[in-house]
């Protein structure tokens, strides 16, 4: 069983039900919808398709809504584009005007209040770089450090800066309401810089009936990296969004930052997704490059919860093969990881009862050479905490509602199983043992470790740790 989960972005190449169905059969766990592109009717069509296919297959494919996030763009040019050379003078302005070879307007009207002399401005994914030389109320006069072509409405970024634009735009609010109405499982919050960004989003979700949605913080700038612990304290996971992050920080630092974020989140018990250009060449070609294979494998070695396909599955020629190849790389890599040695070497912080029981369950599974850990959890918290310790055996997550069942699709090493609410511990134990036997085809005499809450139906009531033998 593959432990690392796979997220696939759904787009023109994968929105056909037959193609999406094959992606699911090849091991897709989460369907991502990128709300930086497309209209609500277009996304509605995709969501309806995803729900129909997962219902047909009877598998927990979760839906992730990826927000556009705070956006900073230049305006338009008289001729559509210009070319700048190193050393040229150029001005960004909040005044409304058509751009030319010397000046262009910007979308964020509070920009001049947030900038300082010496700041760098990156445009078009960092391809053209400017340094601020002087400022007034409306204009930032800059020197071109790295020249290139600028065209209409290209994105802007500001390395090392936290701008004061509200985190939730009107566009994002409308998208969140759309997601709530459609029962999405995850929100991927773009450009998270601090804890308050997540709190603002969660407050909006709470006010509009979206309490059950898990929020994944996309780390795309240095502030997000610096504030990772406080961000993790209020979100349900993070995404190492290497595209924009690689623009905001020196690209040579990206591998070390990725390893740091994965390790930090794993030890904190948060799901972590590694994303962007993982199998980029498969947009056009049927096979990945050797470097891409190593990239996916290294994320798996680091302990990422999931790896993500973007353009490969949304617009590529081989979306089904991309899922298959990613799964094969992950599964083969996992065969070479000594999870027992890693578990014994790691220094975990045990913060509460759920942590303690989850850690004990993993220890018992290793010491008894158990075939599986079976976890009953109303909210999925205990399952995620067992997953945090990356045990060497499969984790069966028994969920009593479909929302929790689908959200377990993103947890490392977890095989989600949908069950009913049981009237007593005896009935629960009976069902759990047989579920493990049937789902995993266990032999009589196999040992399983059981943990989770009792049958009271109260979330967070983890108090059970048992050893059972398969009859």
Language model segments and positions:
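Non-catalytic helical/linker scaffolds that mediate oligomerization, partner binding
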Residues: 1-471
């Amino acid at each position: 069983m593959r432990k690392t989960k796979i997220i696939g972005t759904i787009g023109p190449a994968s929105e056909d039900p037959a193609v999406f169905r094959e992606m699911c059969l090849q091991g897709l766990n989460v369907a991502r919808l990128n709300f930086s592109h497309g209209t609500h009717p277009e996304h509605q069509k995709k969501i309806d398709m995803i729900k129909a296919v997962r219902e047909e297959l009877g598998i927990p494919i979760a839906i992730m809504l990826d927000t556009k996030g705070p956006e900073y763009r230049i305006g338009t040019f008289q001729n559509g584009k210009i070319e700048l050379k190193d050393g040229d003078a150029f001005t960004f302005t909040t005044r409304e005007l058509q751009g030319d070879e010397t000046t262009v307007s910007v979308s964020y009207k509070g920009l001049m209040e947030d900038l300082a002399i010496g700041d760098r401005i990156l445009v078009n994914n960092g391809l053209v770089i400017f340094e601020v030389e002087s400022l007034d109320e409306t204009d930032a006069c800059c020197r071109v450090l790295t020249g290139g072509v600028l065209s209409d409405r290209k994105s802007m970024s500001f390395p090392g800066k936290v701008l004061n634009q509200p985190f939730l735009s009107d566009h994002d609010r409308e998208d969140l309401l759309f997601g709530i109405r459609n029962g999405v499982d995850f929100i991927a919050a773009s450009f998270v810089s601090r804890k308050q960004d997540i709190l603002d989003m969660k407050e909006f979700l709470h006010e509009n009936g979206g309490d059950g949605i898990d929020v994944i913080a996309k780390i795309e700038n240095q502030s997000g990296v610096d504030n990772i612990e406080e961000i993790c304290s209020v979100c349900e996971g993070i995404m190492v969004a290497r595209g924009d992050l690689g623009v905001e920080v020196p690209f040579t630092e990206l591998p070390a930052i990725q390893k740091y974020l994965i390790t930090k989140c794993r030890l904190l018990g948060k799901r972590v997704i590694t994303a962007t250009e993982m199998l980029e060449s498969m947009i056009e070609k049927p096979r990945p490059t050797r470097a891409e294979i190593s990239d996916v494998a290294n994320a798996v070695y680091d302990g990422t919860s999931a790896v993500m396909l973007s353009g490969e599955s949304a617009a590529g020629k081989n979306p089904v093969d991309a899922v298959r190849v990613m799964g094969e790389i992950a599964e083969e890599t996992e065969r070479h990881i000594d999870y027992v040695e890693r578990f014994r070497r790691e220094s975990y912080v045990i913060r509460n009862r759920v942590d303690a029981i989850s850690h004990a369950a993993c220890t018992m599974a290793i010491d008894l050479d158990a075939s599986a850990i079976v976890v009953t959890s109303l909210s999925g918290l205990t399952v995620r905490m067992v997953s945090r310790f990356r045990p060497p055996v499969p984790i069966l997550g028994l969920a009593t509602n479909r929302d929790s069942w689908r959200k377990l699709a993103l947890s490392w090493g977890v095989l989600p199983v949908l069950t009913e609410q049981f009237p007593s511990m005896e009935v629960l134990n009976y069902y759990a043992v047989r579920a493990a036997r049937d789902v995993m085809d266990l032999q009589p005499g196999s040992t399983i470790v059981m943990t989770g809450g009792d049958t009271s139906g109260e979330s967070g009531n983890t108090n059970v740790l048992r050893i059972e033998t398969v009859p």
